[in-house]
Amino acid sequence: MSDAAFRDWETRVAATWKIADTLTPQELVRTIDALAAERPVDDPFALFERACARDTAGIEDGAEPLYRAALASGALDAYRHARASIQLGSTLRHLGRLEESERLLLAQLERCRAEGPGAALHDEVRAVLAFTWIAQGRTLEAAALALETLAPHLSRYNRSMAANARALLQPSRR
């Protein structure tokens, strides 16, 4: 598929996601699957979109192997890789596989740190990790992570909010 054809395919996929709320879960999966069928069967971008459709439709056990295959290809760009990791981490949480979710999200968080400022979806990784920690019963750690993630986005009190979030985890606070 040429670059122009791939861009056209991506545009049509994006158009489907724009109307996803108007489709039934089954229609969304069918529509994305039809678009994915235009690509090779092992195409990581098509696998990723198929996983997203199943995830959105509440078919987590169908999404998981597709996310894994897309990630295993090593061909996803940093943004899609981050999205696939985040979404697979969330899927694993929904499937009750909390430790696996945490490991995957921590690995993605490390990739974000290695990429430096502006890493794709850094805050989003942290938000989903906080949900995993809540599901594990680690609510104080989850709250600290969520508040520390939020702090830079506040119009005021950024430093004090970040410091207070970190202080939640100090032994004297427990």
Regions picked out by a protein language model, each given a short descriptive name:
Residues 22-26, 60, 98, 139:
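TPR-repeat structural position
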Residues 42, 80, 117-121, 157-160:
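Structural signature of alpha-solenoid helical repeat junctions
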Residues 32-33, 68-72, 106-113, 147-152:
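Amphipathic alpha-helical segments of tetratricopeptide repeats
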